[in-house]
Swiss-Prot record:
Protein name according to UniProt: Ciliary neurotrophic factor receptor subunit alpha
Membrane-protein topology: Lipid-anchor; GPI-anchor
SMART domains in alphabetical order: FN3, IG, IGc2
Motif (WSXWS motif): 290-294
Primary localization: membrane
Keywords carried by this UniProt record: Cell membrane, Disulfide bond, Glycoprotein, GPI-anchor, Immunoglobulin domain, Lipoprotein, Membrane, Receptor, Repeat, Signal
Species of origin: Mus musculus (Mouse)
Paired cysteines (S-S): C46-C89
Maturation-removed propeptide residues: 343-372
Low complexity composition-biased segments: 311-326
Length: 372
């Protein structure tokens, strides 16, 4: 009897291990996929479990707070994009998986924006579309093209998923084209359509390889060249005209030149020494609209190289002084009477630095006065 107890314990443990193994490795039911609108409230039931069943909810492997539960149901309010994920409901005691929901939060589509353009005239045209706002969930688009009552094939672009191409069946047709597009997702659908004449959607791609160069010895000229867009299939039969605009970087106002033919132009009124920005657009000679502007080219008109002048070394300046033969202006000095002796005779004024003849004349005049 004592020996049977260990055997019983082993049997229980083996059964438990088998149950755990079976739970982990048995194939599980694929999760239910559910789409809900952004901002809405949603209630997720725990599969077929009763309302009062003891369950635990997880999202992406993380336990959810019990206050989000109403019985066994999970309540999510004011859905945000972050609520998207894999929700799983487990039996609280055995952790047996009861139910899974893969929740996607998004929006129904708004009216799509549709446009058509022929940049390969006369081969065909393409139509492209997009939604004005994202839906955050997968969308399906369906395009229908009619030429009168005839349905035309719209071949999907291999690189751009929101574009398809249509070949012209009849050139210069007066019958209008009608293009319709519908979009749908799990939360709703929408449609739009446009009608147009063949010639109204012709719009070439911008000119290519726009290059601007200075003209040697011409400080106000720039030579501009470009190429016809490579997507334009037959420029000989369907020639293009061009529109050139240019301005110095220091100004905001453009100058324009329309050219009926050719792929080159010389600007003759550029500001000397100022950098310029140049762009070119293209248009069919007869129909359609102007292309977008090309990639900008930059150039500065020719400027003369500064000259480096070599000069001979200047000789050091020499100062030549000459002595004037004229004596400097005389200075007058009144002699001190004490220097003339102690006699009581009249004082005699001596002018120093005065020519001798003047001194002698003054002495003679004094003597005559004494004799009188």
């Amino acid at each position: 009897m004592a020996a049977s107890v260990p055997w019983a314990c082993c049997a229980v443990l083996a059964a438990a291990a088998a149950a755990v193994y079976t739970q982990k490795h048995s194939p599980q039911e694929a999760p239910h996929v559910q789409y809900e609108r952004l901002g809405a409230d949603v209630t997720l039931p725990c599969g077929t479990a009763s309302w009062d069943a003891a369950v635990t909810w997880r999202v992406n492997g993380t336990d959810l707070a019990p206050d989000l539960l109403n019985g066994s149901q999970l309540i999510l309010r004011s859905l945000e994009l972050g609520h998207s994920g894999l929700y799983a409901c487990f039996h609280r005691d055995s952790w047996h998986l009861r139910h899974q929901v893969l929740l996607h939060v998004g929006l129904p589509p708004r009216e799509p924006v549709l446009s058509c353009r022929s940049n390969t005239y006369p081969k065909g045209f393409y139509c492209s579309w997009h939604l004005p706002t994202p839906t955050y969930i997968p969308n399906t688009f369906n395009v229908t093209v009619l030429h009168g009552s005839k349905i035309m094939v719209c071949e999907k672009d291999p690189a751009l998923k929101n574009r398809c191409h249509i070949r012209y069946m009849h050139l210069f047709s007066t019958i209008k084209y009608k293009v319709s597009i519908s979009v749908s997702n799990a939360l709703g659908h929408n449609t739009t359509a446009i009608t147009f004449d063949e010639f109204t959607i012709v719009k070439p791609d911008p000119p290519e390889n726009v290059v601007a160069r200075p003209v040697p010895s011409n400080p106000r000229r720039l030579e501009v060249t470009w190429q016809t867009p490579s997507t334009w299939p037959d420029p000989e039969s369907f020639p293009l005209k061009f529109f050139l605009r240019y301005r110095p970087l220091i100004l905001d106002q453009w100058q324009h030149v329309e050219l009926s033919d050719g792929t080159a132009h010389t600007i003759t009124d550029a500001y000397a020494g100022k950098e310029y920005i140049i762009q070119v657009a293209a248009k069919d000679n007869e129909i359609g609209t102007w292309s977008d502007w090309s990639v900008a080219a930059h150039a500065t008109p020719w400027t003369e190289e500064p000259r480096h002048l070599t000069t001979e070394a200047q000789a050091p300046e020499t100062t030549t002084s000459t002595t004037s033969s004229l004596a400097p202006p005389p200075t007058t000095k009144i002699c001190d009477p004490g220097e003339l002796g102690s006699g009581g005779g009249p004082s005699i004024l001596f002018l120093t630095s005065v020519p001798v003849t003047l001194v002698l004349a003054a002495a003679a005049a004094t003597a005559n006065n004494l004799l009188i």
